[in-house]
Amino acid sequence: LAGSVFLVNLISHLLKEETMHIKKCFTAIFISSAFLSAGLVNSHAAEAPVQQQKVAKPNVVILATGGTIAGSAASNTQMTGYKAGALGIDVLLQAVPEIHKVANVKGEQISNIGSESMNNKIWLKLAKRINELLAKPDVDGIVITHGTDTLEETAYFLNLVTKSDKPVVIIGAMRPATAISADGPVNILNAVNLAASKDAKGRGVLIAMNDNINGARDVQKTNTLRVDTFQSPELGYLGYFENGRPVFYKATTRKHTIDTEFDVSNLNDLPRVDIIYSHVNDDGRMAEAAVANGAKGIVHAGTGNGSIHEAAEPALYDAAKKGIVVVRSARVPNGPTIESTAAWDKAGFVHAGTLNPQKARILLQLGLTKTNDPQKISEMFKQY
C-alpha cells in the first residue's frame, strides 16, 4: 500500500512539472511571436515611403476696374492714344500664368473704365466687395487692377475704409496690354506675390508697381509717361521686390484699415467736396461757385504753405460761417501744410499736413460722414 501511495505521488509530481514546462514553452512562443510581429510592423513602416504634406496655396481675388493695364492699341509700338479698359480680367490673367504657381487666383470685373472717370459709385461698390471678400476665411488677399490717373486716390480711399488687416494691393500700368514691353504683367505677378505674403498683413493698402512697394497714404503719380511714375517723394518707399519676393524696410505710422472710424457699408454716396486751385489773380469766385453748387467741404490748394490770396479770403470765410469745412492744402508737391495766420485758425480752417489736395479731399469726404465740426475734422487729419 505504501508503495502504491508513493507511485501515485511520483506520477502527480511529474505531471505538475510537465504542465509548468508546457506553460513556459507557450509563454516563450507568445512573447517571441509578439516581438516578431512588432518587428514586421516596424519593418513595413520603415519601408513605407514618406509622403510630404502639401502646403496649401493662398487664395487671392483680383478685382478689375479697367485702366491702361487693360488697354488696347492699334499696334505694339503705340504707347499713347490707346483705348483704356478694353480688355476683361480673364484676358489679363491668361497673360500671366505664373500667378497660379503663387496662389489660387480668381478674377472679378467691378468696372472697365479709364480711371479719369472714377466716381463715388464705383468706389463704394469696390470697397463693399473688398470687405465682403476679406470677411471670408478662405480669402487671403486682394489685388485691384486700376487706371493710373486716379490710382493714388482710390488707394487712399480704400486705405481708410477697408475693414481687414489682410493684404490689399492696387496696381496699374503705364503701357497698354498690347505694348511691346507692357509693364502690366509683371505688376500683376508682383501684386499676387504681395497679396499672398504674410509680411504684407497689417500694412494698409499697398501699391505694387515698377518693382517698388508704396503705401497708399503717401504715394503720388509723378510723371505722365514713365513706368516709375509712382513714388513717395516725401517719405519714401515701404519696400521693393526681389525676384518677385516682397522685401519691406518701412511701415506707415498713420491709422488705416481696421483702425479707422469710417464705415461705408450703408452709404450710397459721399458728401460733395470741391478742390479750389489757387493762382495769381484768384478772386474767390470758384469758392463761391462750390458753395452755390452744394459743396459740404472745400479743399483749398494754396500757393506755398497753403497760402490764400487776399482777394479769395472773404469767400472762404463766408463758406466757413455757413458750416462748410475748409481745409488748407498746397499745390506744391512736397512738404507739409501747417498752421499759419491767426485769422485762418479763428475761422476754423483745417490744415492738411502732408496730404496733397486730392487726398485731403478724400479724408474730408469721409470725415463729413461723421461730423462737420472743424475741430474734430482737424483731429482726423492728425491721425490719418
Give the predicted meaning of each segment:
Residues 154-186, 193-196, 321-330:
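Short, acidic/small-residue loops that bind anionic groups at enzyme active sites
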Residues 47-132, 314:
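ATP/NTP phosphate-donor binding region
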Residues 22-41:
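Gram-negative bacterial Sec-dependent N-terminal signal peptides
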Residues 171-242:
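Internal gly/pro-rich beta-alpha loop/helix module
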Residues 144-166, 308-317:
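Short Gly/Thr/Asp-enriched flexible loops that form oxyanion-binding sites at enzyme active sites
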Residues 1-19:
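Short, Lys/Arg-enriched N-terminal segments with co-localized hydrophobic residues
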Residues 305-384:
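C-terminal non-catalytic interaction/assembly regions of soluble proteins
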Residues 57, 63, 67-70, 88, ...:
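Accessory alpha-helical/coil subdomains and C-terminal extensions
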